[in-house]
Amino acid sequence: MIKIAIKIPKYKFRNSCYWFYILKNCVFSFLLFIYTNPAHAQFPEGFSATGNFDEQEISVTDTSGKVSILINAPTNLDHKRKTFLIFYALPNGNTIEWTKGKKTQPGDDWHFNIQHIAAQTRYVRHLDKKNNYILVYLMAAQKSWPAWKRNTPDSLHIIKKMVDSITALFASLSPKIILNGHSGGGSFIFGFLDAVEKIPANIERIAFLDSDYGYEEKHKTKIIQWLKQSKKNKLLVLAYNDSVVIYNGKPLVSPTGGTWYRSRLMQRNLSEAFAFTSDADTAFITHEALKGQIKIILKKNPGGLIYHTEQVERNGFILSLFSGTKFNNKKYFTYFGDRVYEHWIKD
């Protein structure tokens, strides 16, 4: 049994439960019980059907109010399928509802129309019916993971415990984990990497959606070792040339602080262990290695424009889940093309 605090009714299961561990420094306000028979696992009662797109959700808040979590899952979870548990760390300045997205009406906040993570997830589920996709939205109270880490004692330990505890809730599904994030959300991913001696075997994909500001050379060894562990492990990095952007009369980022610089540094570091092929056209520079296990896509920016969230909106989140798979095909979607998920946007 896992003791975690969430402000919802107790979950009930038909078989006996067991104590697993107590989530230190990030205790939620309710009890969740892990069903111990995988063959007959039930989904927790605390989830509520959304009434849209055959989904169910549960909102979770830690007792100190520092992290808000929303877990979204399909109602037709099949325990015979492979399950991907996606941890999506929110970008700076965004709420969970903005990040999910919806069809906007006059007067709506513009943030509702710039990511559409919910609709992109629905498109992924529609396209890949052989796998389960459970999505975990993670929002820091400051709406900034870098600020949260700076102001939270033992932040690395808390990040790891959050990932471990939420993963344990779905133990009967033996999920594979995807660490994903946009903008400052990359700080959450690096927080997890810094918290572990070795990237765990259940991490099957890491995606930085213009979010690798925090990359340092110290991370390369762990990433290289993880990529060598399994051909199933995949790394995707999306970035644009933010080094040429002038905003309000000043450079948007420092010469070494943007994702353009950090992504190229990561590619150079990884090239010490892996042979890359590089292609360029008028729009992108693409670096690949290990037959698509590693893909780093850098958008050129001759006009000095801001493409920060557009990389996510224009099918970037879909790419983050499908890169290196049979679904990474133009007949299904094009990165930086038209939004293929319009039909899946909630009213």
Each model region followed by its residue ranges:
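The feature captures the conserved acid-bearing segment of alpha/beta-hydrolase catalytic domains
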Residues: E197-T286
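A domain-start/cap signature at the N-terminus of enzymes
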Residues: A39-L85
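Alpha/beta-hydrolase active-site loop
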Residues: Q142, P146-F170
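Glycine-rich nucleophile elbow surrounding the catalytic serine of serine-hydrolase chemistry
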Residues: G181-F192
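Short, surface-exposed "cap/lid" segments of acyl-processing enzymes
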Residues: T75-Y123, L127
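Cap/lid segment of the alpha/beta-hydrolase catalytic domain
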Residues: T99-D108, K130-P153
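C-terminal accessory extensions appended to soluble enzyme cores
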Residues: G249-D347
